[in-house]
Amino acid sequence: YDCQWIVLDHLSIVVSDQDGILDERKAIDAIMTKLRKIVQQTGVGLFLISHLRRPQGKAHEEGGQVSLSELRGSAAIAQLSDIVIGLERNQQDDDPIIRNQTTLRVIKNRFSGLTGPACKLQYDSDTGRLTEVDDEHSFF
């Protein structure tokens, strides 16, 4: 096979399919360890989608900044990942342009250490596409 990338959307579905699992955190730890081994042994790239916990401050749907501590389930998600990217959007903004604009934030970067806002993406409801928009605060 010539598989180069795997997209796993989302981790909680994999965990919920495990028979007899009583401790979600331990199940996520075990699954993350297995996924990490697959990536290391095969060289395949893995995009893993994880849901977030409710934040202490500003809600995510109101544009709250995503952090590693908000990954739901286990610290192993962040510990075993090379890069963690969060998507942030204020779905409640009065301005439809802002409401459909997403910040792509690098939260962890094992390769270079660069973290922070990487770019802004604008959603076009006519095409269903995201397009990068100019942003002076991006590090790229």
What is the role of each PLM region?
Residues 27-31:
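…and closely analogous acidic/polar surface helices at protein-protein or active-site interfaces
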Residues 1-6, 19-22, 33-42, 54-140:
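C-terminal regions of RecA-like/P-loop NTPase motor modules
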Residues 14-15:
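Catalytic P-loop NTPase motifs of RecA-like helicase/translocase cores
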Residues 10:
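Walker B catalytic acidic pair
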